[in-house]
Amino acid sequence: EPQLPALDESTPTVLQTLDTSGVVIQPLKSSQLVRDAVVIIDNLRNGTLVRDRTIVQRPDGRFQVMEIDGELYIDERSYQRYDALVDWFVSIEEAALIKNYELFKPLMQEAYGEIGYPDADFTDAMLEAIDVLLATPVPETLVQVKDDEVMYTYADPAFEALPPAQKQLLRMGPDNI
């Protein structure tokens, strides 16, 4: 078992290890990768998003809508902004993901303790976050939205009532959920 670096200096080691295990690291961007990932996962398990702790590059382009018979719908071209990110994520070999998770779990556990959970198992938080994402409904048809001047909201009350993390997944499109 290799010696792990201090949490503060772990990002270069994590990136190098991911790279050597076949994970494409180009989309990753964070100077504190482990800490940021832990904060993101902790928030995801509660259905929330943390936009200031993004560990991957944001997609190019803007959210787009289209009008059909006077109603607004998410333009399917809007979903394509996320294709590269989703393709990258699903390209990660499960074995490499598990191996690296197990290797760096002590650092993730330390970071989890720093944000207020010193006695909780980070793996439980990870599984809860995955459950939240897996519970996102997959739309069968075009998704109707309303323009509320500041932002678009979902016309379907069931979609609008979803936690922010699931609403973000809906914005990525049914093929990317």
What are the residue ranges of the model-derived segments?
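Mid-length scaffold segments of soluble, non-membrane domains
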Residues: Q64-D124
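Generic structural concept
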Residues: V38, K105, L127-I130
